[in-house]
Amino acid sequence: MVIILTIVGLILLTGFQALVNSLKKTYLIEIQYYRQFNQASSSLNWAKKQVWQPPSEQWQCLLDNQYQFKACIKKSRLKIDNYTLLRAQADDYYLYMLTYFADNHLIIEKGHWLDYCPEKRLVDCE
């Protein structure tokens, strides 16, 4: 009887340990996602205040070494309006924003923040 209780207890502890490991992995993945999202979001806000050269067909990037911000702009290929595509990067996570370009600054309109690239072809997002 003692052996059966020991085996059942061992099985329960093993199952509980597997559950804890799974939850810990999920937690670490979510922490990394939120860190990257917040870093990319901060990069977007930083990029709005920078002085840019006129956008071209190629990505033009600015870096901030102190805070590890990276943001890039290029002309959007969307047929509507004359958008400039702003891309902020944190590791391998990207956020996008459709903006207008005037006087070497980006003009932002509310509602143009995106967590996906709005271009039709994937190659235009790389």
Regions found by a protein language model. Give the residues of each.
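Short hydrophobic alpha-helical module
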Residues: 15-19, 43-50
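Aliphatic-rich helix starts adjacent to a transmembrane/signal segment
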Residues: 3-38
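Charged/polar interaction segments and conserved charged motifs
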Residues: 1-3, 7, 53-57
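Conserved functional hotspots that engage anionic ligands or polymers and/or phospholipid headgroups
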Residues: 26-27, 34-38, 45-126
